[in-house]
Amino acid sequence: MIVETGHFALILALCVALVQAVIPLVGAQKGWSGWMAVATPAALAQFGLIAIAFAALTYAFVTSDFSLKLVYENSHTDKPMLYKVTGVWGNHEGSMLLWVLILAMFGAAAAAFGGALPERLRARVLAVQGTIGVAFLVFVLFTSNPFLRLEEAPFNGRDMNPLLQDPGLAFHPPFLYLGYVGLSMAFSFAVAALIEGRVDAAWARWVRPWTLAAWIFLTIGIALGSWWAYYELGWGGFWFWDPVENASLMPWLLAAALLHSAIVVEKREALKSWTILLAIMAFGFSLIGTFLVRSGVISSVHSFANDPERGVFILFILAFFTGGALTLYAARASEMQAKGLFSMVSRESALVMNNVLLAVAALVVFTGTVWPLIAELFWDRKLSVGAPFFEKAFTPFMVGLALLLPLGSMMPWKRASLGKLVRPLLPALVLTLAVLALVWVMATGRPMLALGAAGLGAWILFGALAEIWQRAGRTPGRILRLPRADWGKAFAHGGLGIVFAGVGLLMAGQVEDIRVAKAGDSFEVAGYTITLVSVEDVPGPNFTAKTATMEVRQGGKLVATLHPEKRIYPVQAMPTTEADIDNGFWRDVYLVIGDPQEGGGWAVRTYVKPFANWIWAGCLLMAFGGGLSLTDRRYRSAAGARRATVADAVAAE
């Protein structure tokens, strides 16, 4: 009965979404306040109904209701409770239900906290959100229904993919979806602005918090996925340039560009058309990523589903929303003329360059991701585009961004003087040169890569600190009184610098050793003595494992005792490799036990990875900085609304 209630709630949610999509839009066009007022209760009701449906599906997983097809295919009575819950979204149907839940949640948040918005703008934004909700609810109900019953309930289920039974991956999809779907708010604001023919400083102030929130969630989601790949898959890498990974990177880059261009609209009322285009394309690339992950048109090491019928449906959604928005953009963008003028050397120009670099970087990732599909369609050639292409094509744009970032942050609006600009950055430049000298003395492996990474990372980090010092008027007592947005910007930029340094130094200095070892054998890797003490059978809650005990020593002193595993999940008869890592500030010692070899030995892989944890520490700092900025009172206030002189004005400029 609970499952049927959830299914019925999902159908009702579709009906409410239809009302939300049509009635407020007509009301805004006609100026009927009563019709526009329907948007808020409809958005709240839609969220409540989808939450009921999601709760019903969660209940079915927790209680192991194997009469439900989805539970049978993705759960088992022996599975730990955490993975019973995360199994709700560890599959295509459940993940799409989570998608529409988050979509409705953002719409409900806009309805609940959007009281400062002009009445017509709020109605149109919520109507666009409702239209997106209609499309995805139809997709869920007709192609991906999570509430289908089996004629006879089996005694037990088939279990979830063992690779997904991990705490890191349990929370990776929700954060990623919060980012993907969060960009729908920027899209809805962009389409509403195009309908009204109005983009001004107030609009930019309204759209920035939603974009920033989506960017924060994407940052956390990408970091969690990368961290999971690093420690769970056993290959020692953190980014594979796989289509599924690229699907999240592209909207992240465009969301970052949108954040910076919206600042120019807010402060100088320039880049209006470009900002609208970025808002459309950021969500458009979220839909493109969804299509790539779920259609099966491109081979991926971890695609979610390979169903051409679903892929065609998602392609239709992509074409309808992105194509429709771009058509509207082509018709109305010319009305949004820029007001603010600026010189070639100014903060506006630096932000334009920032946008160009980020947008072209996203285009490079997109080209490399879809090129195998293009080659097969037009030339009937099967090929793959791997890490070498992306590293060579993507890296130059990131290097340019790193060099520009501290300079642009210090520039004043409208016009800047190079002489006045360089002076506050001299301490940052001196400290960067000191870091370069230190790395030059200590670097091994690929010293030029290490120098470049350390130099760029230090330049960004020290540049962020120099900006904080400059904004405080070079007075220590004023530093802590700076607005949270200033501190958030410094943390986010500094975190990016740490990521730059971590990625480059890891790639320059990592050491890999692959060998066969027997119990009692010791061997040397990068100054560490590794001893394989034993390999034993250890039972788990829903798996059996060959667990190795391995000691790591340095200079005769025991540093760590690690226990890498080779697991077998009997329900799916699937082996997995569980690495064990001695995490450190300066390096990771990463051990993997492989298959047994002839003569009683075991395949053993050892990696020593310098500065690996700096990558995820930098990502967390970026997300923290974004969150700190989001708590700034200037984001929470309705100042933008107060600056809108006529709430119902349709055309301006």
Curated annotation (Swiss-Prot):
Subcellular location: Cell inner membrane
Entry GO terms, CC: plasma membrane
Keyword Metal-binding recorded: no
Residue spans crossing the bilayer: 8-28, 42-62, 97-117, 125-145, 175-195, 210-230, 245-265, 273-293, 311-331, 358-378, 393-413, 425-445, 449-469, 491-511, 610-630
Keyword DNA-binding found: no
Keywords, sorted A to Z: Cell inner membrane, Cell membrane, Cytochrome c-type biogenesis, Membrane, Transmembrane, Transmembrane helix
Cross-referenced Pfam families: CcmF_C, Cytochrom_C_asm
GO molecular function: heme binding; heme transmembrane transporter activity
Topological category with respect to the lipid bilayer: Multi-pass membrane protein
Intrachain S-S bonds: none
Gene Ontology biological-process entries: cytochrome complex assembly
NCBIfam families reported in the protein's UniProt record: nrfE, PRK10369.1
Family to which the UniProt record says this protein belongs: Belongs to the CcmF/CycK/Ccl1/NrfE/CcsA family.
Function: Required for the biogenesis of c-type cytochromes. Possible subunit of a heme lyase.
Protein name (record): Cytochrome c-type biogenesis protein ccl1
Species annotation: Rhodobacter capsulatus (strain ATCC BAA-309 / NBRC 16581 / SB1003)
Gene name per UniProt: ccl1
